[in-house]
Amino acid sequence: MEAVVFVFSLLDCCALIFLSVYFIITLSDLECDYINARSCCSKLNKWVIPELVGHTLVTVLMLISLHWFIFLLNLPVAAWNIYRYIMVPSGNMGVFDPTEIHNRGQLKSHMKEAMIKLGFHLLCFFMYLYSMILALIND
């Protein structure tokens, strides 16, 4: 059963890595003016909820399967994703708003956040891979 938990977490983490890379590519396209702010934000806002659900699902799964260290490692990122989604002002298009993305260095902060998430998901990927191999060997 433990191996199934880590296989699912590994697959989910792969999806989150690809999503982080997509965020970085789309934000860098906006930074270089290859796409306009409205299309960039609509592309990115489509994937905010799937990212939130995917990461929260793994966090809850680690809590249920009693992997406390991994749960506590994932909890701040899941809480940040939930906080970021809840705190969107009512007039905005979503987490990524085309009217504000160029203001106050928001583009740079979104890019930095995407890079940090990519590093975090890569760390989690190798941690889940190691845990999955260990669980398969122990079974």
UniProtKB/Swiss-Prot annotation:
User: Where, subcellularly, is it found?
Assistant: Membrane; Endoplasmic reticulum; Endoplasmic reticulum-Golgi intermediate compartment
Q: Which residues cross the membrane?
A: 5-25, 57-77, 118-138
The record gives the membrane topology as: Multi-pass membrane protein
Q: What GO terms describe the biological role, i.e. biological process, of this protein?
A: endoplasmic reticulum to Golgi vesicle-mediated transport; protein transport
Per the record, GO CC terms?
COPII-coated ER to Golgi transport vesicle; endoplasmic reticulum; endoplasmic reticulum membrane; endoplasmic reticulum-Golgi intermediate compartment
Q: Which UniProt keywords apply?
A: Endoplasmic reticulum, ER-Golgi transport, Membrane, Protein transport, Transmembrane, Transmembrane helix, Transport
Q: Does the keyword Transport apply?
A: yes
Gene Ontology molecular function: CCR5 chemokine receptor binding; signaling receptor binding
One of its Pfam families is Cornichon
Q: Tell me which family the UniProt entry assigns to this protein.
A: Belongs to the cornichon family.
**PANTHER family attached here?**
CORNICHON-RELATED
Give the protein's function.
Involved in G protein-coupled receptors (GPCRs) trafficking from the endoplasmic reticulum to the cell surface; it promotes the exit of GPCRs from the early secretory pathway, likely through interaction with the COPII machinery.
Q: Which proteins does it associate with, and in what oligomeric form?
A: Interacts with Sec23/24 complex components SEC24B and SEC24D. Interacts with CCR5. Interacts with ADRB2 in the early secretory pathway.
Q: What's the protein name?
A: Protein cornichon homolog 4
Q: Organism source for this protein?
A: Bos taurus (Bovine)
Its gene?
CNIH4
